[in-house]
């Protein structure tokens, strides 16, 4: 697949003397992160908060409930596949805006219907919008980060900190809305989150687009992806493993007797831990240009997913949320850094697209497969065990990915 380069302007923010030059790339990527905040942090992950109420009110099985995340992941994969071409046509920032608007509109649709097919289509659209926003935004963020080579990994990770922040926001709202309005109020949660998203999107929409933001008529280099095949498999396993945990963990907490406060605290812990990752992992990401940073982060991720199997106390659940959260959003940063370190800039779109496809297939298969296992076994504990096993296997694979040689990069 030959993908176009998604170019980023040197500055998205106004060149005001009040904004120091060293700060502009960080602020730019934080503003770009509003796309993933709405499309992923709220649009995808908040579903876990309303899943128990939707499942009870709409009389769904776990397989049916998990299908909503499966179709969302399929939409994400589709959005990721069209993101580069869309950005080539309309510009990278315009693609991020359009994808975020599509995700926001689909949140409103979720508040308007209880029909399974209509909800599935809305979840599909959320995924498409999120995929466009994340991939187009990720390419822009990677280019923005080049303005500060010494802090490039940190500046890039600010963009990928968007989903954890969205998790915190939804965690502070959804459980208490459900508690206030009672069973069957899942649609009110979607309405409130859609209204919140309409406020959050404003800075992204008013960000100026200078003439330098135009996408050049340049095509990406054809680079063999075979040398990074292990990385692709590892990312597939990560996609399948992490989404299973995030899909069912709130239902697990509720089944243990956790009320709104417990559910909110658990979810916010995941998000807060995830938001801290740019500072926690910056040295790890810079240590090695092969797969070892990804392997280390995935191992921590797997430990977090496995902890609930060792005990059900509030302290153990809180530890699980913190450990899982501090690792899960950094895997994408690590794989993007692997591409940036090992391939020429003109090959980034093709490599990132391949990683996105691998990840997308994994997270499409993960929820439905784990949901079917849960229905068959009758316990969410099996879902968490499968999640941890997939993440640990992904870590083992990543550890075998070596730094690409010059001949690999040029092949």
What are these regions (language model features)?
Residues 79-91, 277-289, 375:
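Helix-to-loop junctions at the C-terminal end of transmembrane segments
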Residues 48, 227-268, 275:
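Extracytoplasmic gate region of multi-pass secondary transporters
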Residues 79-114:
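Conserved MFS/SLC helix-loop-helix module at the cytosolic interface between two early adjacent transmembrane helices
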Residues 342-377:
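A late C-terminal transmembrane helix in Major Facilitator Superfamily
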Residues 175, 194-214, 397-401:
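C-terminal membrane-cytosol helix-exit motif in multi-pass small-molecule transporters
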Residues 106, 117-125, 315-323:
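Paired small-residue
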Residues 122-161:
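Cytoplasmic helix-loop-helix junction between adjacent transmembrane helices
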